Amino acid sequence: MSEELISKKDLLDLAGISYGQLYRWKRKDLIPEEWFIRKSTFTGQETFFPKEKILERIDKIQTMKENLSLDALADMFSPNISDLQMEKDDLIKRNIVSAAVMNFYLENDKSGLTFHFPRILEVYVLEKLLQSGEINLDEGKMVLQVLKDNAPLIKQKSCELVIFRKLGVSSCLLLINTEAVHFESGTKLVVSLSLMTCMEEIKSKLL
Amino acid sequence: MELKNMGDLIINGVGASNGGKFQLVTLNGHGTVNSDIECSDFECNGSGTVKGDVKANTAKISGNASFKGTIDSQQVTVEGTAKIEKNLYAKHLYVSGKASVGGKVKSEEINLHGILAVGEDCEAEIFKGKYRFTIGGLLNADQVDVELYGECKAKEIGGQTITVKQHKGSFIGTLFKPFFKTQLETDFIEGDIIELENTIAKVVRGNQVKIGPNCHIGVVEYTEEFSQDKNAVVGESKKV
């Protein structure tokens, strides 16, 4: 998963933004600190960014800043879980979860019809995986259990959910701040899903 | 947060408290607070120590205060000496004494008339710096306005408008001049509009760059305009 990097100068050119804007977004935490990668070059130290991620983020900021204030944007990108609560019906109405997946989730989780953010995330992840046909219901239960067991971690860090199969037996794991994962050749990687992206997707659907 | 009905914590003379929620906290004399406090107004006039975090609407330090934790307040005024081991979050920060922060400073407006030392990054919308400062990380502000009275240092400076001016010295100032270096030392300066005097930097990048007297700049990279004073040394300047 080694990424292509882009230097700050090229980024400004490519995205058509100024230093002032870039630093302002950094101050507002719209661009995470980890993306500022310092490397020494022949002119001294230079800052680089993961190219794909930063361009996508800047694109998002630029299209959304017309409607939203920078602070509202910052809330959206921040991994901190908002103290949001929603009802089961609301989630279905807003197309975050389909009724079928919601019923499956509620069969396995009996803590009521009011959803706070961690539960919304769980059900959203299930929805994504089940609807795309990548996992079956049994695997869904397994994913749910991993997400529930590690809920405190998911809150703070950028996590990635990885599901893999070998000889028809599936397993799943949660990666925290990892660079790369490698499997032996008989293993099939079913899906790797960034929970951070999921959170952003949910938030953009809610707004 | 409802602090209206909370009591006050006032320590006159030598005393200690275990912290908690208050309306008004005043440490006169030698006061120690052993854990976190949350209050509407915090004031320290003598020598105070807080061993936890402080959350307040206004915080005023006129004496000598030391904080083992973080300060989070709308308005922070330092007229004496304040030592903060972790971070300082303040909407408005005014320093006319000496403030040293071990972690980072996050603010909207920083007005500095004294000495400010920051271990990590310093972020603000407006940074007005007079006298002296040392910033271990990045000084990131929309408007950076520096008037040099002494030796200032920052690892990097970034923002939209960056102005560094030499203070027009008084008579006494010129007498003692050989003992004090009035200059700003930094690795990088990046901004849209940059105007510098008495600055030593390795790299300056910007759209409109104006290099004034007594500058030593390694490389200037500009996109629109560039001008250089005859008393400035610029290693290389290129339009990109």
Predicted features by range, described:
Chain B
Residues 1-240:
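Extended beta-solenoid/beta-helix repeat architectures
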